[in-house]
Amino acid sequence: MTKKRFTLIARVSTDNRRAIKNALEELFAKRSITSTDEGFLVEVTMHGDSARELNRSLLSALRRAERKTRLRSEWKSGGTTERFFDYVLKGSRKA
């Protein structure tokens, strides 16, 4: 399968902000991470086979740092947007 380019906009919330901030900084450039009242906002571009696989990999990495981490994400590629809450696909739409 060909690697696709995805644009990610994600809201990450957790009880342990320090652990998640460190995990996010290991995964992404600091300039793509913004601190919010609820946690963090992440805006990056990633390459992978599918939004589902990228989302699963990201949430698994974050939960290794802090188990009680929540991820609300939107993955955009090729005119399609897929929304996830944690590991669950909540919707998909064509642009």
Model-identified regions with their sequence ranges:
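Long, contiguous binding/interaction regions
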Residues: 1-95
